[in-house]
Amino acid sequence: MNIQINILKFFQSIRNPILNAFFLILTISTEVPVIVILTAIMYWCINKKYGQKLLFSLTANIAINTGIKEYVKAPRPIGTEGLESLRVSTATGYSFPSGHTQTATTFWTSLMIIFRQKWMYILGLIMILGVGLSRLYLGVHWPIDVICGWIFGIVFTIMFSKLFDIVDKNKDYKLLLLTLIPFIIFIFIVKSESYIKMLGLLSGFILGYIIEDKFIKFNTIDEYKKEISFSSKIDTNKDYIVKSAYRFILGIFTLLLVFLIVNYIMP
C-alpha cells in the first residue's frame, strides 16, 4: 500500500494547470456521453458489424467491471491522508478495477482489432495508457486498479471479439444467449442493483442484435455502397448522409428516453 500511495503522491507533486487540463480531457474521453456518441456513429453510420462487435465488447466488459467492483468492494484513495483527489464527483462506487481504464482499453483495443492499421495501434496505445494514467493523476484510483483495468480490458476484449466473430459468421444466436448464463449466476453472488443494471445493458445488446440481424437488417455505408450503383443519377453520398443523420438522431433520442425511464424506475 505504501508503494501505491507514493505513486499517487508523485503524480500529485507534478500537478499544474496545463497537466490538470490534459489529464482531465483524457479521463472525460472515456465517459458515457463520449463513448455512446462514438459507438453510435460507428454502429448506425459507418459499419454495422464493426459497431456490433464494439458494443458487445463494451457491454460485456462494463458488466464484468461492475460485477468485480461490487464483489471486491475496494475503497478508493479519495480521503486518504496526504492525498488530494480531483474531479471526485464522477468517481463514484468502488475502486477495483478502474472502470474508466477498462472501458478505454476495451474501446481502443476493439478498434485496433477491427482496423488493424499502424496509426490505430499508435493512437489506441496512447489513449489506453493516457486514460489509465489520468486516473492516477487525478488521485481517484490506486495503481493496482488501473493495472488490472488494462489487463481485464485487453483479455476480455480479445475473448468477446472472437466470440462475436463466431456468432456472427454462423448466426449462432443460442451461443450468444448462453454467454449470459455466468453473468446471471453472478447476480446471486453480488446481489447488486448496479450490476443488474449493467447486465440489463448487455442483455439489451444481445436481444437487440438478434432482432436486428433476423428481422431489421438496416444498412450502413459499406452495405449501402454495395447496393447503390455509383453510376446512378441519385446523389448517393447525399442520400446516405441524410439517412444516417436521421438514424443517428432517432437512435440517440431513443437511448436518452430509455435512460430516463430506467433511472425513473430504478433511481
Feature locations, PLM:
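The first (N-terminal) embedded transmembrane alpha-helix
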Residues: 25-36
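Transmembrane alpha-helix boundary signature
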Residues: 67-81
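Short, strongly hydrophobic alpha-helical membrane anchors
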Residues: 1-21
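Short acidic-aromatic active-site loops that bind/stabilize oxyanions
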Residues: 12, 27, 97
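N-terminal signal-anchor transmembrane alpha helix
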Residues: 53-71
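Membrane-embedded catalytic cores of phosphoryl/pyrophosphoryl-handling enzymes
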Residues: 22-23, 38-39, 44, 52, ...
